């Protein structure tokens, strides 16, 4: 039942945002009483925290797989981003939800998520960029800034309404990576 509640809450939060969903709506969508919902979760903030943690687990595996595959820093980065686009858009949308609604978590959960997000997602991406710079593959730029720029490019594709066409197999991902890694300038 917990998994069903989490799936339902995720869908509703992604669709309407954290503040746009009441516990009653989650219980109704699950076909359970509000009391039964509270038996499994103490409140919306706990639901949101578990959703974020589960997504972070999922995306950390994607990042690790991309980096652990070896090769050039660009090849690793391409594997990571393609891996992110192999995740269904409904799951990718959780990253948008996290960026928008992390402030709804209690301070302790927000801090814990922020630390885990940095350690398991942002930090490895920054290290990948730093390694590419150290190897002379990337121009010397601040890895933190570069990662935030990358996420800024990816962010629109994490919206269910716009991201459905962008998959690991679509040309969109390769175009995005080509522009990110090599710019828009002509090389001929």
Model-identified regions with their sequence ranges:
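Hydrophobic alpha-helical connector segments
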Residues: 50, 64-93, 146-150, 173
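Helix-turn-helix
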Residues: 4, 8-46, 50
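Short coil/turn segments at alpha/beta junctions that flank glycine-rich nucleotide-binding fingerprints
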Residues: 15-19, 70, 91, 135-136
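Amphipathic alpha-helical packing segments from all-alpha helical-bundle domains
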Residues: 57-65, 90, 108-134, 144-148, ...
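Short helix-capping/turn signature of helix-turn-helix
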Residues: 41, 99-105
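Hydrophobic/aromatic-rich alpha-helical bundle segments in the mid-to-C-terminal region
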Residues: 95-100, 111, 130-179, 187-188
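Amphipathic, non-transmembrane alpha-helical scaffold segments
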Residues: 6, 48, 52, 56, ...
């Amino acid at each position: 039942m917990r998994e069903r509640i989490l799936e339902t809450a995720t869908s509703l939060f992604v669709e309407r945002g954290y503040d746009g969903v009441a516990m009653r709506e989650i219980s109704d969508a699950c076909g359970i009483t509000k009391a039964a919902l509270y038996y499994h979760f103490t409140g919306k903030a706990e639901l949101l925290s578990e959703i974020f943690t589960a997504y972070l687990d999922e995306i950390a595996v994607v990042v690790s797989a991309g980096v652990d595959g070896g090769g050039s820093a660009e090849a690793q980065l391409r594997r990571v981003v393609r891996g992110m686009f192999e995740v269904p858009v409904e799951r990718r949308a959780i990253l948008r939800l996290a960026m928008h609604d992390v402030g709804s978590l209690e301070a302790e959960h927000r801090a814990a998520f922020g630390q885990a997000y940095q350690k398991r997602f942002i930090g490895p991406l920054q290290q990948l960029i730093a390694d590419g710079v150290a190897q002379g593959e990337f121009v010397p730029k601040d890895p933190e800034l570069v990662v935030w720029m990358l996420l800024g490019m990816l962010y629109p594709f994490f919206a269910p309404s716009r991201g459905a066409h962008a998959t690991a197999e679509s040309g969109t991902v390769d175009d995005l990576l080509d522009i990110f890694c090599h710019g828009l300038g002509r090389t001929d």
